[in-house]
A protein has these predicted regions:
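Short pre-active-site segment immediately N-terminal to redox-active cysteine/selenocysteine motifs
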Residues: 43-47, 54, 106
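Sec-dependent signal peptide recognition
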Residues: 1-8
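Hydrophobic beta-strand anchors of alpha/beta hydrolase catalytic cores
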Residues: 39-40, 73, 110
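Thiol-based oxidoreductase modules, predominantly thioredoxin-like and allied folds used
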Residues: 66-93
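Non-catalytic, surface beta->alpha helical segment in thiol-disulfide oxidoreductase systems
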Residues: 100-101, 105-132
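Short active-site neighborhood of thiol/selenol oxidoreductases, capturing the structured segment around
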Residues: 33-47
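N-terminal "domain-start" segment that seeds a small globular fold
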Residues: 10, 14-31
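Typically the conserved alpha-helix immediately C-terminal to a functionally engaged Cys/Sec
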Residues: 51-66
């Protein structure tokens, strides 16, 4: 788990990865524990910094077959009050209803969880860009 967290930190600050595109996968049910580590990008619509984090860091982990089954990467719009998903504890949430309990107030926020839903370290806030 520590190695995955270090990779996320490295990738977060690395300009080496770039790929464009839409949002990452939206979780439907996190209770099933599809991977030992779960990385979640909490984003807002039209957030340019969220797109940078998505492009420069998380899309690489999401697409790399070497991480399949080891790391799941998702994106949740924490202003969304319509789409719901099952959290690790079995309760249903929307991005908006989960933001409060997790203290997500800033976009982008990246959090890493183990398969049981325990946070693996402090959230990463913001982006590693000179203008940020």
């Amino acid at each position: 788990m520590k190695a995955i967290w270090l990779f996320v930190l490295f990738a977060w600050f690395s300009p080496a990865f770039s790929a464009g595109g839409e949002a990452l996968s939206f979780p439907s049910n996190l209770q099933h524990g599809q991977a030992p580590a779960v990385v979640i990008l909490f984003s807002l619509p039209d957030c340019a910094y969220c797109e940078k984090v998505r492009q420069q860091s998380l899309r690489h982990i999401h697409a790399d077959p070497g991480y399949r089954g080891r790391v799941a990467v998702y994106e949740i719009d924490f202003s969304d009050s319509k789409r719901s998903f099952t959290w690790f504890d079995g309760n249903r949430y929307t991005g908006k209803s989960l933001a409060g309990p997790l203290n997500v107030k800033f976009s982008p926020t990246v959090m890493v969880f183990n398969a049981k839903g325990t946070a693996a370290g402090k959230p990463l806030l913001g982006a590693s860009l000179p203008e940020f």
